[in-house]
């Protein structure tokens, strides 16, 4: 009688490395220009005042200042406001 060892275990058991997405600088934190604020897939959070949007939808600070998360027209927005000196 023909026999074959059961296969299939090699077809499972893979996983990808986590992409370390999410908010990197929180509301009220002081940031420098160029600091990454949010890493995301798609625009879950939109850029506001003094915030740039990268090719991979990364949000980053354009000026030195304080981070502020807001909602505008039902969308989450992150802005950076200059520190009052």
From Swiss-Prot:
Q: Which UniProt keywords apply?
A: Ribonucleoprotein, Ribosomal protein
Which domain of life, per UniProt? Bacteria
| One record GO biological process | translation
- Pfam families with a match to the protein in the record: Ribosomal_L27
Q: Which GO terms describe its cellular component?
A: cytosolic large ribosomal subunit
One GO MF term attached to the UniProt entry: structural constituent of ribosome
**Which residues are in coiled coils?**
none
What is stated as this protein's family in its record?
Belongs to the bacterial ribosomal protein bL27 family.
Q: What is this protein called?
A: Large ribosomal subunit protein bL27
Which gene is transcribed and translated to give this protein?
rpmA
């Amino acid at each position: 009688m023909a026999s074959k060892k059961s296969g299939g275990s090699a077809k499972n058991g893979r996983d990808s490395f986590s992409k370390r997405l999410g908010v990197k600088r929180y509301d009220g934190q002081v940031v420098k220009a160029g600091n990454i604020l949010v890493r995301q897939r798609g625009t879950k959070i939109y850029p506001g005042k003094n915030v740039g949007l990268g090719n991979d939808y990364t949000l980053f600070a354009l000026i030195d200042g304080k981070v502020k998360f807001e909602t505008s027209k039902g969308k989450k927005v992150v802005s950076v406001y200059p520190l009052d000196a």
